[in-house]
Amino acid sequence: MREMITIKPGKITVQANPNMPEEVANLFRKQHYEIVGRHSGVKLCHWLKKSLTEGRFCYKQKFYGIHSHRCLQMTPVLAWCTHNCIFCWRPMETFLGTELPQPWDDPEFIVEESIKAQRKLLIGYKGNPKVDKKKFEEAWEPKHAAISLSGEPMLYPYMGDLVEEFHKRGFTTFIVTNGTVPERLEEMIKEDKLPTQLYVSITAPDIETYNSVNIPMIPDGWERIMRFLELMRDLPTRTVVRLTLVKGENMHSPEKYAKLILKARPMFVEAKAYMFVGYSRNRLTINNMPSHQDIREFAEALVKHLPGYHIEDEYEPSRVVLIMRDDVDPQGTGVNGRFIKH
């Protein structure tokens, strides 16, 4: 077990705080999450289930070659975040802020227990006549960890070790972060423990939109994100800036988004629609959900301000458009290619 941290303006300090209250854990369980240890969680992805029962797949399979049925969707920080984003589909009204759990579970424990939790959630599909036996057996042995799901995963202070534990087991890894913990990325760079693909979710083109859409719980969130984007530039791993676009809220100023993207110069940019699902329905309306055509038009406007980038692909079921840097090999794998090297 490890000590805890609490994020503070400009630095991270140690501070005592109780573990996740049982009423919060029970709310997650009702939403079909498996609680892992003191502060982590696992949930079967919508597209994993669709892949097993219908042969459909997530846009990440089309864009990057990640097999949806072999993806483990987890988070080491289930109920803690630095933002209160209006579009979040998680039950963030019960989130516990930025005062984090004590003590921390070890990375090895989290990885092993997350795999067990995934299998517990999968077992009901074993006898399903719609599920191919071979595909189920592959799903039983996940090979890709999507470290996102809920909360802000980079608040976990041993993220580099967590990534390393997954890699030891032959996993590829994605981390999806809101970019407010740049010191964690600095540590991972120094330790040479980067994920296979690092996402930062940028959901505002300027600080005014950031304050109204992301509703930060820390006073220097925007400055932290700017630092994170600078750190991403030229990282020796795959990098993505994801724009979650909410009609009537943050779907404006493509030229300002472009300036932020060029700070990081990622391999990929994903322009993706907000989806009217989960708890976000308590805060927004279906009119806030862009159509795929809306996303396509925004991506076309955005790429005009992104020299060295082009629209590479799109996936209408997920309402997402992939923008790619011109020097990325469209048929290649690894850190210089479009596809993940397994």
UniProtKB/Swiss-Prot annotation:
The record's free-text note on cofactor binding? Binds 2 [4Fe-4S] clusters. Binds 1 4Fe-4S cluster coordinated with 3 cysteines and an exchangeable S-adenosyl-L-methionine.
Q: Which InterPro entries match?
A: Aldolase_TIM, rSAM, tRNA_wybutosine-synth, tRNA_wybutosine-synthase, TYW1_archaea
User: Primary place of residence?
Assistant: cytoplasm
What reaction(s) does this enzyme catalyze? N(1)-methylguanosine(37) in tRNA(Phe) + pyruvate + S-adenosyl-L-methionine = 4-demethylwyosine(37) in tRNA(Phe) + 5'-deoxyadenosine + L-methionine + CO2 + H2O
Example of a GO MF term: 4 iron, 4 sulfur cluster binding
What residue stretches are annotated with the Radical SAM core domain?
64-312
Give the record's family classification: Belongs to the TYW1 family.
Any idea what job this protein has? Component of the wyosine derivatives biosynthesis pathway that catalyzes the condensation of N-methylguanine with 2 carbon atoms from pyruvate to form the tricyclic 4-demethylwyosine (imG-14) on guanosine-37 of tRNA(Phe).
Reported cofactor(s): [4Fe-4S] cluster
Swiss-Prot/TrEMBL keywords: 4Fe-4S, Cytoplasm, Iron, Iron-sulfur, Lyase, Metal-binding, S-adenosyl-L-methionine, tRNA processing
CC per GO annotation: cytoplasm
Task: Output the GO biological process annotations, alphabetical, semicolon-separated.
Answer: tRNA processing
Q: Which residues bind [4Fe-4S] cluster 2?
A: 81, 85, 88
Q: Which positions bind [4Fe-4S] cluster 1?
A: 45, 58, 71
Q: Look up the EC number in the record and give it.
A: 4.1.3.44
Q: Which SUPFAM superfamilies match?
A: Radical SAM enzymes
Describe, as the record does, how this protein assembles with itself and its partners. Monomer.
User: Do the record's keywords include Ion transport?
Assistant: no
| Name of the protein in question | S-adenosyl-L-methionine-dependent tRNA 4-demethylwyosine synthase
Which superkingdom heads the taxonomic lineage of this protein's source?
Answer: Archaea
Q: Where in the cell is it found?
A: Cytoplasm
The record's Gene3D superfamilies line, in alphabetical order, gives: Aldolase class I
